[in-house]
Amino acid sequence: WLCAHLWEHYLYTGDIRYLGHIYPLMRGAAKFFLSTMVREPKNGYLVTAPSSSPENTFRMPGDKESAVSICLGPTMDTQLVRELFTNTLEAAEILTLTDKPLLDSLKSALNQLPPHTIDSEGRLMEWLEEYEEVDPQHRHVSHLYGLHPGNQISPTLTPELARACRATLDR
């Protein structure tokens, strides 16, 4: 997430020298995720684990009493990783860097991240599975990071996902 702020600063200023200074941080963060992400067993997606969706909890199927927060690859994590990998690739291209092994790994990993998914109610899913939320009116909508402040979801480029975000907010 912090690398996103650095990247936004570069986009605003267009300062190539600044980009050269922040690239090692972006590269390091990307390498960290490449080295710590795991295969999700159901679909083989590359995900963060263990993780959680900020401050939100869900119920395990068949258990109406528990409040679980630990999961594999929550949507916000996937959005942050997708953004970081994409920005790191773009920064390397702008800087004309030839870090082929890393760049190839980032491109490959991007293709292995879980896609955004819409639940049976038409909302953007917060987790890989369609869990019952403990508090459906929970104040956090971190899984909409890809809509804002990120740019992975937009009404013009991904209208179905934008409608799912709207449904999440309207709930």
Question: What does each of the following model-derived ranges do?
Answer:
Residues 1-16, 20-24, 74-171:
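Active-site core of glycosidic bond-cleaving carbohydrate-active enzymes
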Residues 28-91:
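Acidic/histidine-rich catalytic neighborhood
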